[in-house]
């Protein structure tokens, strides 16, 4: 008699994805972030569901409903802070996951990579709309500033912004629709994750060497299930330390002031995970130019498969490319720092230089260095 696990129409899908999946024998801890992102998504959907049971998406009561969750709902404060800091953990895992893909050349799986970039956009959109919901000062002004960017689109811009707002300013209609979209998007993300995995399992996982590993595969369970459990424990430990000891460490104090359209906060800035893109946006004086740079700063990831000129897939054996990669990482840290600083000297020029360097490394330096390495190896 054959195993139910291998014959049942539904269970065999799970079996081929998480149990009997042939995986490379040498994938490192950098391959843990996929499962951690799945866990983050589940945590966010569950905590979000419980928050939605008590939240009201009305401008008059939104702020006080969040206060009510924190004060009166059983463990409401815990659910709220797990959700808020869970978003930060989500983005940390996302950035590391994308970084791993760039370093080891995983982007040569076109479909998987492009779905991944779409997922990144979807998660960023969800996080932005979620930040608006508590209806604090930074929620309101963040929504106003970011939605206003669409007015830079020629001809239809102004109409488009008013259409998104549902009026002539960010108001009740905006909050209600943002709540609706914030609720539905994670389920769309979950569906995209399924497609992401579907494409990945067509090719199999990449590995640190970038070489074909068909001759040396091991079953996913128990080897990588136990490895993922370690990652999960570390993620949950980090998240709970953040939630229980300094829940507001990554938040903005301005968001504890109810939204007031008549008083602008001195420094409008998004959550930390958007600061690098915000710095790129601010470094261009032209509105439309800034918006295009902002979009292209993420969309440029889709160009990586086309810009890959090296004869080797991974950067494991390419020391020059490694150096350039880590300069890019340092540049992103610099942009994140600049995004949180006021618009004044010397931050303006640092931001502009870091933005130029970001695009130059990706579009020019990395491909050039790849070609130099090919020449050095007489390939």
From Swiss-Prot:
Q: Which UniProt keywords apply?
A: Electron transport, Heme, Iron, Membrane, Metal-binding, Mitochondrion, Mitochondrion inner membrane, Respiratory chain, Transmembrane, Transmembrane helix, Transport, Ubiquinone
The record's comment on cofactor binding reads: Binds 2 heme b groups non-covalently.
Q: Name one GO biological process term.
A: mitochondrial electron transport, ubiquinol to cytochrome c
Which residues hold heme b b566?
A: 97, 196
PROSITE patterns according to UniProt: CYTB_CTER, CYTB_NTER
Transmembrane residue ranges: 33-53, 77-98, 113-133, 178-198, 226-246, 288-308, 320-340, 347-367
Q: Which cofactor does it need?
A: heme b
Annotated membrane topology: Multi-pass membrane protein
Give binding positions for heme b b562.
Answer: 83, 182
SUPFAM superfamilies, alphabetically? a domain/subunit of cytochrome bc1 complex (Ubiquinol-cytochrome c reductase) (SSF81648), Transmembrane di-heme cytochromes (SSF81342)
Where does this protein reside within or beyond the cell? Answer: Mitochondrion inner membrane
* GO MF term (any one): ubiquinol-cytochrome-c reductase activity
- Mind telling me which InterPro entries this protein's record contains? Cyt_b/b6_C, Cyt_b/b6_C_sf, Cyt_b/b6_N, Cytb/b6-like_sf, Cytochrome_b, Cytochrome_b_C_euk/bac, Cytochrome_b_N_euk/bac, Di-haem_cyt_TM
Classify the main location: mitochondrion
Residues reported to bind a ubiquinone: 201
State any further remark. Heme 1 (or BL or b562) is low-potential and absorbs at about 562 nm, and heme 2 (or BH or b566) is high-potential and absorbs at about 566 nm.
Function noted in UniProt: Component of the ubiquinol-cytochrome c reductase complex (complex III or cytochrome b-c1 complex) that is part of the mitochondrial respiratory chain. The b-c1 complex mediates electron transfer from ubiquinol to cytochrome c. Contributes to the generation of a proton gradient across the mitochondrial membrane that is then used for ATP synthesis.
Family designation: Belongs to the cytochrome b family.
Subunit relationships: The cytochrome bc1 complex contains 11 subunits: 3 respiratory subunits (MT-CYB, CYC1 and UQCRFS1), 2 core proteins (UQCRC1 and UQCRC2) and 6 low-molecular weight proteins (UQCRH/QCR6, UQCRB/QCR7, UQCRQ/QCR8, UQCR10/QCR9, UQCR11/QCR10 and a cleavage product of UQCRFS1). This cytochrome bc1 complex then forms a dimer.
Q: What is this protein called?
A: Cytochrome b
What species is given as this protein's source? Spermophilus musicus
